Amino acid sequence: MSQAEFEKAAEEVKNLKTKPADAEMLFIYSHYKQATVGDVNTERPGMLDLKGKAKWDAWNELKGTSKESAMRAYVDKVEELKQKYGI
């Protein structure tokens, strides 16, 4: 898995013909954050920020996942979404 493949996938996901389902978007978001930042390094958003909490929780579930594993899962998911939604 190369950084270039990961960056290409990050650009391609922005060009999908249809917006992926919320669960798919959470997968993409959380794996991108784990690959680029690592483990969660912020406080969990407040109780009124439902979207923020969902994103934080999805990212936090990946705690301990290596950058390489997160990048691979991200690229694989983007490839799946490209087949499903088109680009």
Swiss-Prot record:
Q: Name one GO biological process term.
A: positive regulation of phospholipid transport
GO cellular component, alphabetical, reads: endoplasmic reticulum; Golgi apparatus; mitochondrion; protein-lipid complex
Give the transmembrane ranges: none
UniProt keyword list: Acetylation, Endoplasmic reticulum, Golgi apparatus, Hydroxylation, Lipid-binding, Phosphoprotein, Transport
Which residue positions does N6-(2-hydroxyisobutyryl)lysine occur at? K55
Q: Which residues carry this modification: N6-succinyllysine?
A: K8, K17, K55, K77
Q: Where does an acyl-CoA bind?
A: K14, Y29, S30, H31, Y32, K33, K51, K55, Y74
Name the SUPFAM superfamilies for this protein: Acyl-CoA binding protein (SSF47027)
Q: Give all N6-malonyllysine modified positions.
A: K55
Q: Which PROSITE patterns match?
A: ACB_1, ACB_2
Keyword Phosphoprotein assigned to the entry: answer is: yes
Segments forming a coiled coil: none
Q: Which residues carry this modification: Phosphotyrosine?
A: Y29
> Which stretches make up the ACB domain?
2-87
Residue positions, PTM N-acetylserine: S2
* GO MF annotations in UniProt: identical protein binding; long-chain fatty acyl-CoA binding
**Has the keyword Acetylation been applied to this entry?**
yes
What is stated as this protein's family in its record? Belongs to the ACBP family.
Tell me, what does this protein do in biology? Binds medium- and long-chain acyl-CoA esters with very high affinity and may function as an intracellular carrier of acyl-CoA esters. It is also able to displace diazepam from the benzodiazepine (BZD) recognition site located on the GABA type A receptor. It is therefore possible that this protein also acts as a neuropeptide to modulate the action of the GABA receptor.
Q: Which named protein is this?
A: Acyl-CoA-binding protein
What is the organism of origin for this protein? Oryctolagus cuniculus (Rabbit)
The gene designation is DBI
